[in-house]
Design a protein with these regions (language model features):
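Core catalytic alpha/beta fold that binds nucleotide/phospho-ligands
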Residues: 1-207
């Protein structure tokens, strides 16, 4: 399972990314997992989900072999109280770690199917500026941006098309700005965009 690279958006964020290699056997965790993680591993029914879970734990062990992931209301938190966000899509698995709160990461494969659901996560202004050149890639980039912000917010009841807004960006953009807006609060996020062959990855950090 070769390591692709470390992404370094800024000094306060640690991001590691792996591509799962089907030629490598990682389906037998042996003694690599603690008892809680082993139960989670067993609960994963599909083999690809098991592989993704093991890959995420291997990434964490590269940061610190003694780290473990605890969960509070299904939200992951590292045992040293740092914050973590995890994302995976097919053979790509990535983790984002920071001492700061308000972080999120998401990775998705670029797919034309995103066109059929764009009205569910974009407002009309966003749809307009994202139409045209490299539309599938930019729609996917917007989707990962909103997912990353959603993960950073860690709150229920969010409507992507209304509460999470992405300022205009283009195909060449490597950074952007996103906002969460509700009736009683507003939060602003710095976005970091990465193109990974047929995937889009976005990191969000509250500013």
């Amino acid at each position: 399972m070769p390591l692709l690279n470390d992404l370094v958006p800024n000094k306060s964020l640690l991001c590691k990314l792996w591509r799962i290699d089907d030629s490598e056997d990682i389906m037998h965790p042996n003694n690599e997992l603690n008892s809680d993680d082993y139960q989670i591993f067993l609960s994963r029914k599909a083999n690809h989900m098991k592989r993704q879970f093991l890959a995420s734990r291997k990434l964490i062990s590269l940061v610190d072999p003694d780290l473990r992931v605890d969960y509070e209301n299904n939200i992951p938190l590292l045992s040293d109280n740092r914050n973590i966000s995890i994302s995976h899509c097919e053979d790509i698995v990535t983790i984002l770690i920071s001492e700061n709160k308000g972080i999120g990461i998401d990775v998705e494969r670029i797919n034309n199917k995103v066109h059929s659901i764009k009205s569910k996560f974009l407002n009309q202004k966003e749809i307009n500026y994202l139409s045209g050149y490299e539309e599938s890639r930019n729609l996917t980039k917007a989707w990962t941006a909103k997912e990353a912000i959603y993960k950073a917010l860690r709150m229920p009841g969010i409507i992507f098309s209304e509460n999470i807004l992405i300022e205009e960006f283009n195909n060449e953009s490597t950074t952007g700005i996103g906002k969460f807006i509700s009736t009683n609060q507003e939060k602003k996020f710095k976005l970091y965009f990465y193109d990974l062959d047929n995937y889009c990855l976005t990191i969000s950090q509250e500013i």
